From Swiss-Prot:
Name of the molecule in the record: Putative uncharacterized protein DDB_G0282129
Disulphides: none
Residue numbers spanned by region Disordered: 9-61, 128-164, 265-289, 301-373, 409-526, 540-560, 668-765
Low complexity bias: start-end ranges: 40-61, 143-161, 301-311, 325-344, 353-373, 414-428, 438-485, 495-504, 513-526, 668-745
C-alpha cells in the first residue's frame, strides 16, 4: 500500500511558531534543517541540488518522489557460498502501550483520516501527471507551492493527525500481517513435521509469499517481498521530522518483545530447485547464510552464520552454484521450499531481507532424530574402539622399547675383558629405555663405525639436563642405586687371589640378549635391565654352557658380579679422571635424583655425603679438599701412571662397613699406596696412556679422549667430563692417576667424601 501526502515544515517557508508539539505523540519534532537524520538518505541535499542550491525549497514534496530517491541507494542482499537463500526471522510489532495509545487516537480521528486520504489520492494523481519521479524541477515547484498553500492550514492544524493516521495504518497492517504470517507458519510447521515423521521419502514443496513490514529508524520501511523478488520501499522520512534516537529505541523495544514472546521463530525459504525424493533418511541438510547489507553501494556489515535448529538444519553442497537446468536429473525443475525451524539470533536492524531463488543440490535430505541418535551411538562406539586400539598399541610400543642392551664393552684385546666403567642403564617406567637390540641380535651401540654418534649412548640425552654419559640416562628414579645391586669387590675376592678375573662379558651378554629377545617375541615380556637383579634370569642353562667356549666355572660366576664391578670402576674412574685443577667436586647431600655421569650439569657423583673425619685421616682430607700441591700430584701421577693393577684394600677394612665401603679406598696419603678400585688389567692404557675409562669402545684411533661427551653436550661448553680434560696445564695424559681436579682454594678439613650408591637408611644387598 502506498502513502502519498505532503510534507510540511521544510525549515524555509513555515515559521517555527506554526509547529505545535503534541505531548501525546511519541515523536519529537524539530525545525532545524541542518540536523539531518542519518537514515533520511540526504533528502535535503538532493532537493538543494535539484534547485541549483537556492534557498527557496518547495514546502511540499510528494512521497513518491522522496521514496523513489531514497529507495535507490538502500539495498540489501543476502548471498551464500552455495546457492543463495533467504531466511527472515524478524517480524517487528509495536509495543502494547503504544498500540493502545494509537487505538485511542484512531477512534477520535477517523473522519479526519478519510478526508486526508481523499486529498492524498487527488494529489497523487496530479503529481503523477505533472512531474517526473526522480527529480523535483523548477517547473513543478509552483504547482507544489500552490498545493502546499491550499493544504497549509490543514497540515498545520492536523500535524499530529498525519502521524497518528499513519501510525494507525501501520499498526493495523503490522497486526494483520503478523497474525496471518504466524498462522501460516504454524500450519506449515505442523504439516512439515508430520510429513517428515510419516514419509521422509517424499519431496516437500511449499511456496509462500511473505510480506514483512519493518519499522526502521528514521522512517517506516514497508517491504513487500514475493517470489518475483519485488522490493518496494516507501519512506516517509521528511527533513528532520523525526529524531532517530526515539525511533531506534522503539524499534529495539518492539524487537526485544517479539523475541521474548517466541521461543522458536519459524521462517520459510523460497526455493526453485530440483529435489529428488530420498528413500534414505540417513542424510541431513544444513543452510549457512551470509547476509550482506549495503547502503549507497557500500558494504555495512556481512554476517555469516549456520542456521541452528531444534529439528534439523540444512546444508547446501557443493559450494558451487549449480543451475537447476544443468543438473543431471532428467526431471524438470519445480517449485519447492523448505520450512526451517530456527532459534538463531535476530539479524541486525535496518537490514531488509530480499528473498532469492536457490538451487539445492541432489545430495541434501532430511535427517530424523532417531537416526541422529543412532549415528551418535555408533560414533561413540567407534571412538571407544579407537581408544582401546590406541592403548593396546601404546602398550606394545612400550614393551618393545623396553628391550635394552648394555654397552659393548669388549676391547678385542686378549682373553681378559677390560671392564670399562660404563654404567648400564637403569630405566624405569617413567623413563623410556635408551638401548635396543639390532636386527642381527647383536649389540652394536658403541662400535667404532657407528654413524649415530653413540659414543657413549648419549645421543638421546641432548635435551635432558640429567645427561648420563655412562649409560645412566634413566636412573632418575633409582635414587639410591647405581646398578640396582652395588657390591663390594672384597666380598668376591679370595684370600689367595688379589683380583677377580671375569669372563667375556660381551659375548655372554649377547647370548642372553638374544635369548631374551626371543622370549619377548613369544611372551611379549619386557627385557629390562632391572631384571639383572634376578639371578635366575641371568644364569645359563646346560645347553648354553655346552655351547659356550669358556669354562663353566667362569660362566657360573657371571651375573651380578660383573655388573657390580662396572659400577665400582666407574666411581673410581670418576675420581681419577677429573684433572681440571680449577673445577670443584660437587657435593650434594640431599639430592639423590642426580644421575651418575651427568657431566653436563657437573653433577658427577650421586649421593656424595659428608662424613666425619674419623673415617679418613686428616691427610686424606687435605688431598680430597684440594690442599695437595701440584708437585705432589705430579709425583703421585707419575709414580702410578703405568701401573695396571693395584691391590684393593689389603686389610679388608670395608667388609664390616657396607655403607662406607669406598671411603677408605679412595686415597690413603699416609702411605705411598693409593688404593684404586680396579681389577686385573681393567685400566688398559691402549699403548698410549690415554685411557678412556668410560669409553674404551669408542677410541676410534683417536687419542683425544673426547668421545664420551663431546658429541652430545649441547648447552655446556665447560663440561667436566671424564675424558675432556686431557689438555690441562699439567699436560698429563694419564687418566688413571690424574688427581688434579679438586679445588685448591677449598681448605675444609671437617668433612670427607663418601661415595655410596645407597642413602644411609638403606642397606646394600
Amino acid at each position: 500500500m502506498k502513502f502519498d501526502f505532503l510534507l510540511a515544515n521544510d525549515g524555509n517557508n513555515i515559521p517555527n511558531k506554526q509547529i505545535k508539539e503534541d505531548k501525546s505523540s511519541p515523536y519529537e519534532f524539530t525545525s532545524n534543517p541542518n540536523k539531518l537524520d542519518p537514515y533520511s538518505n540526504n533528502i535535503n541535499n538532493n532537493n538543494n541540488n535539484n534547485n541549483n542550491n537556492k534557498s527557496s525549497i518547495p514546502s511540499s514534496v510528494s512521497l513518491s518522489s522522496i521514496s523513489s530517491i531514497s529507495s535507490m541507494p538502500i539495498s540489501t542482499s543476502l548471498s551464500l557460498s552455495s546457492p543463495s537463500i533467504v531466511i527472515s526471522n524478524n517480524n517487528p510489532v509495536l509495543s502494547n502501550e503504544y498500540q493502545q495509545q494509537q487505538q485511542q487516537q484512531q477512534q477520535q480521528q477517523q473522519q479526519q483520516q478519510q478526508q486526508q486520504q481523499q486529498q492524498q489520492q487527488q494529489q497523487q494523481q496530479q503529481q503523477q501527471q505533472q512531474q517526473p519521479v526522480k527529480t523535483v524541477n523548477k517547473k513543478n515547484s509552483k504547482s507544489n507551492k500552490s498545493n502546499a498553500n491550499k493544504n497549509n492550514n490543514n497540515i498545520n492544524n492536523n500535524n499530529n493527525n498525519y502521524t497518528s493516521m499513519y501510525d494507525n495504518k501501520i499498526q493495523q497492517q503490522l497486526q494483520s500481517i503478523y497474525k496471518q504470517q504466524q498462522q501460516q507458519q504454524q500450519q506449515q510447521y505442523q504439516t512439515q513435521t508430520q510429513t517428515q515423521t510419516q514419509t521422509q521419502t517424499q519431496t516437500q514443496t511449499q511456496t509462500q509469499t511473505q510480506t514483512q513490514t519493518q519499522n526502521s529508524s528514521g522512517g517506516i520501511l514497508n517491504i513487500n517481498s514475493s517470489i518475483n523478488n519485488n522490493l518496494n520501499i516507501y519512506n516517509n522520512t521528511s527533513s528532520n521530522k523525526f529524531k532517530h534516537q526515539h525511533n531506534q529505541q522503539a524499534y529495539n523495544q518492539n524487537l526485544s518483545e517479539i523475541n521474548n514472546s517466541r521461543n522458536v521463530t519459524t521462517s520459510s525459504v523460497n526455493a526453485n530447485s530440483n529435489i529428488n525424493p530420498y528413500p534414505n533418511s540417513n542424510s541431513s541438510i544444513n543452510i549457512t547464510t551470509t547476509t550482506t547489507t549495503t547502503t549507497n553501494n557500500e558494504i555495512l556489515w556481512t554476517t555469516t552464520k549456520p542456521t541452528s535448529s531444534t529439528k534439523h538444519s540444512v546444508i547446501l553442497s557443493p559450494p558451487k552454484k549449480i543451475d537447476s537446468y544443468d543438473s543431471p536429473q532428467s526431471s524438470p525443475p519445480r517449485q519447492s521450499s523448505l520450512l526451517i525451524s530456527t532459534s538463531s539470533p535476530p539479524s541486525p536492524p535496518l537490514s531488509p531481507i530480499q528473498p532469492t531463488n536457490i538451487v539445492q543440490s541432489s545430495s541434501s535430505s532430511f535427517s530424523s532424530p532417531t537416526y541422529i541418535q543412532q549415528q551418535q551411538q555408533q560414533q561413540q562406539q567407534q571412538q571407544q574402539q579407537q581408544q582401546q586400539q590406541q592403548q593396546q598399541q601404546q602398550q606394545q610400543q612400550q614393551q618393545q622399547q623396553q628391550v635394552e642392551t648394555v654397552n659393548n664393552i669388549g676391547n678385542n684385546k686378549s682373553n681378559h675383558t677390560s671392564l670399562t666403567p660404563n654404567l648400564t642403564s637403569l630405566s624405569t617406567k617413567d623413563y623410556p629405555p635408551m638401548y635396543s637390540l639390532n636386527n642381527n641380535n647383536s649389540i652394536n651401540i658403541n662400535n667404532n663405525n657407528n654413524n649415530n654418534n653413540n659414543n657413549n649412548n648419549n645421543n638421546n640425552n641432548n635435551n635432558n639436563n640429567n645427561n648420563n654419559n655412562n649409560n645412566n640416562n634413566n636412573n632418575n628414579n633409582n635414587n639410591n642405586k647405581i646398578n640396582n645391586n652395588h657390591f663390594d669387590l672384597n666380598d668376591y675376592q679370595d684370600d689367595n687371589q688379589s683380583s677377580y678375573s671375569s669372563p667375556d662379558i660381551t659375548t655372554t651378554h649377547n647370548r642372553y640378549s638374544q635369548q631374551q629377545q626371543q622370549q619377548n617375541n613369544n611372551n611379549q615380556s619386557n627385557y629390562h635391565i632391572d631384571h639383572l637383579n634376578d639371578k635366575s634370569i641371568m644364569k645359563p642353562t646346560k645347553k648354553q654352557i655346552k655351547k659356550q667356549s669358556q669354562p663353566q666355572e667362569k660362566l657360573s660366576k657371571y651375573s651380578e658380579d660383573q655388573i657390580h664391578e662396572e659400577s665400582e670402576f666407574l666411581l673410581a674412574s670418576i675420581l681419577l679422571n677429573l684433572k681440571d685443577s680449577n673445577s670443584t667436586l660437587p657435593i650434594n647431600n640431599n639430592n639423590y635424583n642426580n644421575n651418575i655421569g651427568n657431566f653436563n650439569n657437573s653433577t658427577i657423583l650421586k649421593n656424595i655425603s659428608t662424613t666425619s673425619s674419623d673415617d679418613i685421616g686428616s691427610s686424606n682430607n687435605d688431598y680430597i679438599n684440594g690442599s695437595i700441591s701440584n708437585e705432589q700430584h705430579q709425583y703421585y701421577s707419575n709414580k702410578y701412571s703405568n701401573q695396571n693393577y693395584v691391590q684393593i684394600d689389603e686389610n679388608n677394612n670395608n667388609k664390616n662397613n657396607k655403607n662406607n665401603y669406598v671411603t677408605n679406598n679412595i686415597v690413603n696419603s699416609n702411605t705411598d699406596n693409593y688404593n684404586y678400585y680396579s681389577s686385573h688389567n681393567d685400566f688398559d692404557n691402549n699403548n698410549n696412556n690415554n685411557n678412556n675409562n668410560n669409553n674404551n669402545n669408542n677410541n676410534n684411533n683417536n687419542n683425544n679422549n673426547n668421545n664420551n661427551n663431546n658429541n652430545n653436550n649441547n648447552n655446556n661448553n665447560n663440561n667436566n667430563n671424564n675424558n675432556n680434560n686431557n689438555n690441562n696445564n699439567n699436560n698429563n695424559s694419564s687418566n688413571n692417576n690424574s688427581r688434579n681436579n679438586y679445588n685448591n682454594n677449598s681448605k675444609k678439613r671437617s668433612s670427607s667424601v663418601q661415595i655410596s650408591p645407597y642413602p644411609p637408611s638403606k642397606s646394600r644387598i
